[in-house]
């Protein structure tokens, strides 16, 4: 229901694109949260838009904010907070009072999706869940080299770099089974 309530959805994973193809639909292709976020940052820099940043560890968000100030001087930082907070209502009030044009939420899936669904109506901002993009932007994590991305195996590179993701990656074969079950049995 959270996903159905979203205003926009993107295929941030080759599995979604392949699953749609198996089911007879076509998607324009994979659109990563990181690529979307950096394109929006560039546009916000040119248009002097206000952004609120929420998520990641404190040292990550602090480093990222400094890099954004240096790289995108036209962006107005409406506010920011790390992803470790107990008083959700206080964060929501802070976001609301800062009147941002965009809210980038990096709390991880599915926490960020639930947070956005619950709170996005407190402001007219565009809210976007962007997973671990703050870590990449801050330099605490790296994206796969372009070759891996071009060959749709960025997930394999991430597994190689972060073997602790193995259990999470086990959801991928389960997803594929669900796609085929739906294709052949309609359930």
Residue spans of the language-model regions?
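Short, Asp-centered acidic motifs that coordinate Mg2+ and/or phosphate
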Residues: 8, 102, 126
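Hydrophobic alpha-helical segments within soluble ligand-binding/sensing domains
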Residues: 33-46
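N-terminal nucleotide/polyanion-binding subdomain common to many enzyme families
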Residues: 1-30, 34
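An alpha-beta-alpha
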Residues: 44-71, 171-185
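Short acidic/histidine-rich motifs immediately flanking catalytic phosphotransfer sites
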Residues: 12, 98-101
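A transmembrane-helix-recognition feature enriched in membrane-embedded lipid enzymes
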Residues: 15-22, 44, 143-187
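Glycine-rich phosphate-binding "P-loop"
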Residues: 20-31, 73-86
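Internal alpha/beta domain cores that form substrate/cofactor-binding pockets in large enzymes
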Residues: 52-56, 64-65, 76-98, 107-136, ...
């Amino acid at each position: 229901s959270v996903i159905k309530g979203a205003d926009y959805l993107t295929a941030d994973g080759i599995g979604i694109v392949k699953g749609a193809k198996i089911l007879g639909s076509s998607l324009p292709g994979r659109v990563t949260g990181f690529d979307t976020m950096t394109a929006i940052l560039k546009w916000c820099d040119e248009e002097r838009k206000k952004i609120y940043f929420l998520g990641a560890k404190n040292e990550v968000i602090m480093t990222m904010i400094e890099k954004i100030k240096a790289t995108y001087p036209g962006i107005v930082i409406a506010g920011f907070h790390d992803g470790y907070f107990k008083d959700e209502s206080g964060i929501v009030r802070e976001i609301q009072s800062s009147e941002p044009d965009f809210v980038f939420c990096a709390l991880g899936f599915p926490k960020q999706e639930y947070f956005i669904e619950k709170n996005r109506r407190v402001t007219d901002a565009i809210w976007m869940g962007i997973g671990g993009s703050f870590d990449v932007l801050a330099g605490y994590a790296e994206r796969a080299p372009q070759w891996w991305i071009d060959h749709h195996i960025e997930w394999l590179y991430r597994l190689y770099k972060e073997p602790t993701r193995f259990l999470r990656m086990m959801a991928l074969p389960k997803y594929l089974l669900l796609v085929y079950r739906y294709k052949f049995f309609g359930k």
